[in-house]
Amino acid sequence: MNKIILAADIGGTTCKLGIFDENLNRLSKWSIDTDTSDTTGYLLLKNIYDSFIQHIDKSDNTFSDVLGIGIGVPGPVNFETGEVNGAVNLYWKGTVNVRDIFKQFVDCPVYVDNDANVAALGEKHKGAGNGADDVVAITLGTGLGGGIISNGEIVHGHNGSGAEIGHFRVDHDQRFKCNCGKSGCIETVASATGVVNLVNFYYPKLTFKSSILQLIKDNKVSAKAVFDAAKAGDQFCIFITERVANYIAYLCSIVSVTSNPKYIVLGGGMSTAGLILIENIKTEYHNLTFTPAQQNTEIVQAQLGNDAGITGAAGLIYTYIIEKDGVK
């Protein structure tokens, strides 16, 4: 019987689950509600295990065919131990060792990583990264996160804080406070939240009218509204879009001279803004970046969407067991 990989992408509302074959092709996917009633994490992880059992029982496989289980979690993860510290979206208290809890149910390998890292791994293997060994994924959503793949593996650093790219200091005036407690992080000026921050900061200085004036006054402005107005020629929104693009280009430049990726993959809701954002990023990136570091590097849009996390969770087993150890 062919071997399979089990994958879980744990979110604050739902958990996406899936079964993949040993070539990282998805065989099935489904979701369950995220149970946040248990602050130890045990109940949620048991629910995930039970759901895996139910779906395997309906298939042609048995649990003995499972090569391993990959799990993506929204919070800081110690990759070596499987510990998650501060998963506030799941209401877990203190440190939860996801690997140890799951190993109470199974005897196969269990790999755990941060959700942004696994999304990057998903794009590397099955998305816009085209299987390249050096890929950086940047997620532009309510916040800004991402992951760095170098020489085929996720960059974790000595304590799991490697590639926390949302906290690069780019706003040296430190105008906006970040959720991390510090000010000036790129997340405060180049995420969907950051777009609104910039609108509210610059609007009082406006010398011309804007089509989003009423949205600003009603405190209902959004990144989408800004980008849509920019496409329609609103000069204020074009200015904001260019500022955001410049910050993202600066981030891309930093990662280029640091890890020299083949692909810089832009994902998340803001990446769908279209050419008005992406082309501005590319232009400024080429102006900023050390020439050898940008040669043959492509800035591309993510392809997997909401499936990046579950694909990357399975990718943990594919990368660290099948590819690295040659196990099939």
From Swiss-Prot:
Name the UniProt key words of this record, in alphabetical order. Answer: ATP-binding, Cytoplasm, Glycolysis, Kinase, Nucleotide-binding, Transferase
Recorded hits in InterPro entries, A to Z, give: ATPase_NBD (IPR043129), ROK (IPR000600), ROK_cs (IPR049874), ROK_glcA (IPR004654)
Pfam families in the cross-refs: ROK
Q: What is its EC number?
A: 2.7.1.2
Q: What class of enzyme is it?
A: transferase
Recorded GO cellular component terms are: cytoplasm
The protein's GO terms of the molecular function aspect are: ATP binding; glucokinase activity
One of its GO biological process terms is:
glycolytic process
Q: Where in the cell is it found?
A: Cytoplasm
Which reaction is recorded as catalysed by this protein? D-glucose + ATP = D-glucose 6-phosphate + ADP + H(+)
Superkingdom assignment = Bacteria
Gene3D superfamilies found in the cross-reference section: 3.30.420.40
Q: Which family does it belong to?
A: Belongs to the ROK (NagC/XylR) family.
Q: What is this protein called?
A: Glucokinase
Which organism is this protein's natural source?
Answer: Staphylococcus xylosus
What gene, per UniProt, encodes this protein? glkA
